[in-house]
């Protein structure tokens, strides 16, 4: 079963946390020519809630190194914080389910800003022969990969066996497709959650009230597992 996130932005004014309704968050699905409601507006009042297990792990240690059905997806991240629960002074909203699920947490903009986003992480997954040769062996990120792979014509090889196959030193069956699981070249946490880092955090910075600080803006979120 997959995991999704529900998230709101809040601003503290005069000591009270309020739900932010300002449209400051860029819409990743925006399409000027679209007639779909979710794609028509360039900016939204809620942070993007797209599924990104790397981000979930960074925010709260959720799905840390695990993908769909628990398959390994990479090294474990060092989360900003483990799940804190919902804040007692959370604003009223119709986005979050609350304690009914119990997977809530929150982070201030200061916590997000002071986190080390330049830490390195390596993703892990199954790649086919062409991808391994063209990307992995050159120290580059693959253009596609899977948490696992199976099928009638699929053969899983170890990495040394894949190298031998590419070098024509492993017996090949032309009716089969060959895959291997491996770690990829390191990338930064920032790159693992680039939309959140580049766009969502920029939107949060725009919410800092006059005379306020990064402590006066936060996200409250929950995971729907």
Question: What are these model-predicted stretches?
Answer:
Residues 214-220:
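Short A/G/S/P-biased low-complexity tracts
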Residues 1-213, 224-225:
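Acidic (Asp/Glu-rich) sequence patches and key acidic residues
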């Amino acid at each position: 079963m997959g995991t999704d996130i529900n998230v709101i932005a809040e601003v503290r004014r005069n000591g009270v946390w309020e739900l932010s309704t300002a449209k400051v968050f860029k819409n990743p699905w925006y399409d000027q020519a679209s007639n779909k409601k979710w794609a028509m507006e360039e900016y939204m009042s809620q942070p993007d809630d797209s599924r990104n297990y790397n981000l979930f792990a960074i925010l709260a240690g959720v799905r840390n190194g695990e993908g769909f059905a628990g398959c390994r997806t990479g090294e474990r991240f060092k989360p900003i914080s483990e799940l804190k629960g919902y804040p007692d002074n959370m604003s009223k909203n119709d986005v979050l389910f609350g304690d009914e699920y119990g997977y809530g947490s929150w982070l201030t903009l200061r916590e997000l800003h002071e986190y080390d986003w330049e830490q390195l992480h390596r993703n892990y997954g199954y790649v086919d022969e062409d991808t391994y040769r063209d990307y992995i062996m050159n120290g580059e990120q693959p253009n596609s990969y899977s948490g696992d792979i199976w099928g009638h014509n699929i053969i899983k090889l170890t990495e040394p066996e894949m190298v031998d196959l590419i070098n024509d030193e492993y017996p090949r069956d032309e009716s089969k497709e060959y895959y291997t699981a491996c770690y990829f070249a390191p990338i930064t946490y920032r790159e693992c959650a680039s939309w959140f880092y580049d766009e969502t955090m920029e939107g949060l910075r725009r919410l800092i009230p006059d005379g306020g600080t990064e402590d006066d803006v936060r996200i409250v979120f929950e995971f729907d597992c």
